[in-house]
């Protein structure tokens, strides 16, 4: 029974890791497509509406010294003397970014998310099995006490040694949760008692 659960868990875990890998590849492909639209170094000019011309955003891959309205805005929407007035309204900024750093950050984030998802599935599938085993050992310990008094501690010692050796993170987490729940109940009770006393 346990080997069946472990086999299912491994199949599910490998499926999840493959889906996370596929999602990472898909995201990288989209980022590469987006990188074609916007270079890592660019000049961006935001021009507000002027007379009958609507506002517009212009991007161009040029050097920092040429990052101004006259070099970036093409085609110029106004002619003649209005060009200078139009360019004074435009706000141009030189931008640099590292698309490689962005890609690596996203891959690390997705990897951590995939590992956490895999750990959650592990806890969901394996925790009931561990609880059944520990519950079975406690029943065995009780039945050994009921059977007889010849060597009452020999079997109990073996069962306790096996259950202690299997103590893991899940048991510690469950103990911490139970302790926290008891503390919350005690706090609620003390708050309620104080409220009754004050009334």
Swiss-Prot record:
Modification type Phosphoserine: residues: 143, 190
Maturation and modification: N-glycosylated.
Transmembrane segments: 106-126
Intracellular or extracellular location(s): Lysosome membrane; Early endosome membrane
Glycosylation: residue positions: 61
Family of this protein: Belongs to the TMEM9 family.
Species of provenance: Mus musculus (Mouse)
Signal peptide: 1-34
Lineage: Eukaryota, Metazoa, Chordata, Craniata, Vertebrata
Main location: membrane
Protein name as catalogued: Transmembrane protein 9B
Function: Enhances production of pro-inflammatory cytokines induced by TNF, IL1B, and TLR ligands. Has a role in TNF activation of both the NF-kappaB and MAPK pathways.
Bilayer disposition of the protein: Single-pass membrane protein
């Amino acid at each position: 029974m346990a080997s069946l659960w472990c086999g299912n868990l491994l199949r599910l875990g490998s499926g999840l890791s493959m889906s996370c890998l596929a999602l990472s590849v898909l995201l990288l492909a989209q980022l590469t497509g987006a990188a074609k639209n916007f270079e890592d170094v660019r000049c961006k000019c935001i021009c507000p509406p002027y007379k009958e011309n609507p506002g517009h955003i212009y991007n161009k891959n040029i050097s920092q010294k040429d990052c101004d309205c006259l070099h970036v805005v093409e085609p110029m929407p106004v002619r003649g003397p209005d060009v200078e007035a139009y360019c004074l309204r435009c706000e141009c900024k030189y931008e640099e970014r590292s698309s490689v750093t962005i890609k690596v950050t996203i891959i690390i984030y997705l990897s951590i998310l995939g590992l956490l998802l895999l750990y959650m599935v592990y806890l969901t599938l394996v925790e009931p099995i561990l609880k059944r085993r520990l519950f079975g050992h406690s029943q065995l310990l009780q039945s050994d006490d009921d059977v007889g008094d010849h060597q009452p501690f020999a079997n109990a010692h073996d069962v306790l040694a096996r259950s202690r050796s299997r103590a893991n993170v899940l048991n510690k987490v469950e103990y911490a949760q139970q302790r926290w729940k008891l503390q919350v109940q005690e706090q609620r009770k003390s708050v309620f008692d104080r409220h009754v006393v004050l009334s």
